[in-house]
Amino acid sequence: MASNDKGLEEIPDNQIESNYDEITDSFDAMNLRAELLRGVYAYGFERPSAIQQRAIMPVIKGSDVIAQAQSGTGKTATFSISALQKVDTNLKACQALILAPTRELAQQIQKVVVAIGDFMSVECHACIGGTNVREDIKALNDGPQVVVGTPGRVHDMIQRRVLKTDQMKMFVLDEADEMLSRGFTEQIYDIFQFLPQSTQVVLLSATMPQDVLDVTTKFMRDPVRILVKKAELTLEGIKQFYIAVEKEEWKLDTLSDLYETVTITQAVIFCNTRRKVDWLTDKLIARDFTVSAMHGEMEQNQRDVIMKEFRSGSSRVLIATDLLARGIDVQQVSLVINYDLPANRENYIHRIGRGGRFGRKGVAINFVTADDVRMMREIEQFYSTQIEEMPMNVADLI
């Protein structure tokens, strides 16, 4: 087993033991169809997360796969990308069936499949309770290649022979522990009986209670087992402030002023788009600041050089998109500036949870316009934390 996954050594009882640790660390190396790869990048993915690096390839190769992973690890895209790689777009029939415990999750998955499959002529239908049965029947008769649904409605549609299973290649159970604990066991077992023997089974679950293990032993053949631990990031020890900026256009001056007051050992400045990163970099260079920039459109070797310079301290300020927010430890970062608040709140901890890692203290400063106030409140609530107005003596804190 590769030694880079230290988390695999101590495994509590309800965790599976990983039997697979091959890693594919870029989407380019996965041999995806060109139009699917285009969709992956257009969706905003830069590089695969830990689960995507491990699980996409065995799924594409046709193995049954059990992945133990929490939400927030990138699991939805893992099976969405795999399913889209495997379906025959010329065949109007359900080839991949994805089950989820709730309607909301099923709809969310459908959105991801549709978005990533944007450049492919692929149909994805959400087959969920609480919607019009007749419309469901009509949509299923069109033969969408991917169907996402909740167990009750999917079971009903299979029994009515509306959702035909004869062309099924892949069956995905997302949040299997949730589905089984909600009493869907019988329906799920039933659905298995309708599928062709050759159907590949992919099961994702945060925990591995007995009822989930039963499904894996009854219905899966020699599965690849992948355990992905979610890195525990914390906001402890990180002072979080905001600066109220009246207009978006004034953020640049605010940043310049901040530079004047603060001696920065090293800082990361986050923007939400690649374009903004380039724009801000140019503006700061024009004002004689030394900065480097990093985003997903750069070649990997270019990124590596920039990271090396930043790690060694020869470059002091790095402007980046969320690409940097996951999986890169820069120990000496004392300051993180959110020039833009993250578009989704999960990324907040990935951006600033790093500044204070290894017990180091850190400071995070958020630039907040009137439009951002709601998002900031949501972030505070989500993490049960306080983001306070930046005090005058901020220089003493960094």
From Swiss-Prot:
PANTHER family assigned: ATP-DEPENDENT RNA HELICASE DBP3
Catalysed reaction equations from the record: ATP + H2O = ADP + phosphate + H(+)
Residues the record lists as binding ATP: A69, Q70, S71, G72, T73, G74, K75, T76
Keywords, alphabetical: ATP-binding, Cytoplasm, Helicase, Hydrolase, Initiation factor, Nucleotide-binding, Protein biosynthesis, RNA-binding
Domain named Helicase C-terminal: residues: 237-398
Helicase ATP-binding domain mapped to chain residues: 56-226
Main localization (coarse): cytoplasm
Keyword match Transferase: no
GO molecular-function term, one example from the UniProt record: ATP binding
Family statement drawn from the similarity comment of this UniProt entry: Belongs to the DEAD box helicase family. eIF4A subfamily.
A GO cellular component entry from the record: cytoplasm
Source species: Coccidioides immitis (strain RS) (Valley fever fungus)
UniProt xrefs under Gene3D superfamilies: P-loop containing nucleotide triphosphate hydrolases
InterPro entries: DEAD/DEAH_box_helicase_dom (IPR011545), EIF4A_DEADc (IPR044728), Helicase_ATP-bd (IPR014001), Helicase_C-like (IPR001650), P-loop_NTPase (IPR027417), RNA-helicase_DEAD-box_CS (IPR000629), RNA_helicase_DEAD_Q_motif (IPR014014)
Motif DEAD box, residue numbers: 174-177
UniProt short sequence motif Q motif, positions renumbered to this chain: 25-53
Pfam families attached to this UniProt entry: DEAD (PF00270), Helicase_C (PF00271)
Domain text: The Q motif is unique to and characteristic of the DEAD box family of RNA helicases and controls ATP binding and hydrolysis.
Protein name: ATP-dependent RNA helicase eIF4A
Main EC class the enzyme belongs to: hydrolase
EC number: 3.6.4.13
Quaternary structure and partners: Component of the eIF4F complex, which composition varies with external and internal environmental conditions. It is composed of at least eIF4A, eIF4E and eIF4G.
Subcellular location, record wording: Cytoplasm
Job of this protein: ATP-dependent RNA helicase which is a subunit of the eIF4F complex involved in cap recognition and is required for mRNA binding to ribosome. In the current model of translation initiation, eIF4A unwinds RNA secondary structures in the 5'-UTR of mRNAs which is necessary to allow efficient binding of the small ribosomal subunit, and subsequent scanning for the initiator codon.
